Amino acid sequence: MSEIAEKIKQAGETFEERIIEIRRTTKVTKGGKNLSFRVLAVVGNRNGKVGVGVGKAREVPDAIRKALVSARRNIIEIPVVKGTIPHEVVGRQDAAKILMKPAAPGTGIIANGTVRAILELAGVQNVLTKAMGSTNPVIMAQATVNGVKNLYSIDKIAALRDITPAQVVRGVKKEG
């Protein structure tokens, strides 16, 4: 289990759950058709933590339970600055690509249903997105997670560059 998941159990945080997609799948065998269900679920605390999971089972309730357990196991932290993301980022997964840009207050979440659900439950209130390539919900969810994993907070950028957070925002004056 991930470190974040253990910290959440200790803190006793409450997470909101959302089912993005329930899809019926069929496997055709010589004995007939085997039906099963695939569920895509998101959990988040609307305060920078979100997880995405997929569950598969013969019955819908079992698939939902598996998807929610998977989502809780895969929780990641997202830096949220004044209700938006700190910088522009591109997330990629297979044939899907999602571009996310910070937006001014009052813009809202401009995104498709899958990306919107993930960013809402992460606590992002203003962001512009553009989905390119495949729009399969599972692939889009993974591309979104891959993108937000590459977000850095201002403090982390400052530490990597050995400057103060104020210098990251305003710029460093060149000597000479």
UniProtKB/Swiss-Prot annotation:
Coiled coil: none annotated. GO terms for molecular function: rRNA binding; structural constituent of ribosome. Keywords: Ribonucleoprotein, Ribosomal protein, RNA-binding, rRNA-binding. Residues 15-78 form the S5 DRBM domain. Pfam families: Ribosomal_S5 (PF00333), Ribosomal_S5_C (PF03719). The keyword Cytoplasm does not apply. SUPFAM superfamilies: dsRNA-binding domain-like, Ribosomal protein S5 domain 2-like. Transmembrane segments: none annotated. It comes from the Bacteria. Signal peptide: none annotated. The keyword Magnesium does not apply. Part of the 30S ribosomal subunit. Contacts proteins S4 and S8. Belongs to the universal ribosomal protein uS5 family. The N-terminal domain interacts with the head of the 30S subunit; the C-terminal domain interacts with the body and contacts protein S4. The interaction surface between S4 and S5 is involved in control of translational fidelity. This is Small ribosomal subunit protein uS5. It comes from Fervidobacterium nodosum (strain ATCC 35602 / DSM 5306 / Rt17-B1).
